[in-house]
Amino acid sequence: MFFGKIKKTAISIVLAIACVMVTCGITSDPAYAADMGAVYGIYEHGTGWSGYHGDKTAVRAGNGSYVTAIRASLLGQPDGMSGTLSYQVNLSGTGWLSWQENMTPNGSTETDMPLEAVRMAFTGQLAENYDVYYSVYQNGSWTTPVKNGETAGTEGQGLRVDGLWVTVTGKGAAVPEGPNERSVDPTRPMVALTFDDGPSKFTPRILD
């Protein structure tokens, strides 16, 4: 009898707490934030770090330069939602480096070796609620956006990464349109490359 009353009292307390949580809008899962986005930067050979660029910004190295490292994080991550935006790079001559996060540089700022490919992915609850899409500028154009750990770029083909584009969407949302800037201006004359001029050690494109 005594233990029965204790059991009923405990159940009543649990129900009361549940009612308060519902009434106050408190849940066990953090709220989804539609306006969360990526923020990122590139290390441009011969120049240094670019500024921080927001979600869906196409960031490219200057003419004749290329990317040797990247860094990235998030803006607007929901309070209480676990996880980070992680990123991995393939450094020419070295291969895939370890995953990094929270604006930790990944690549090299003390070498002339370019990046050849990039991977990005969410961890924790972020991975359950969001997709991260990304593209690199390589061989004269932007690659088709890939997501969640897939490889953007090439490996072992001698092609360098010249730019980076990143965007965040809700889990399972439609595939976003990639960078739409023109890679070639047909109104500008083409420059012939002679034997004396090059190519450079790391050509930005496949030469015919």
Identify what each model region corresponds to.
Residues 8-19:
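Sec-dependent N-terminal signal peptides
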Residues 20-35:
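Sec-dependent signal peptide cleavage junction
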Residues 19-20, 208:
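Hydrophobic alpha-helical membrane context
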Residues 177-208:
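Active-site beta->alpha N-cap acidic-glycine motif
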Residues 8-10, 25, 186:
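Residues at the start of alpha-helices and the adjacent loop-to-helix junctions
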Residues 1-6:
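N-terminal secretory signal peptides that target proteins for export/translocation
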Residues 34-180:
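Lectin-type carbohydrate-recognition ectodomains
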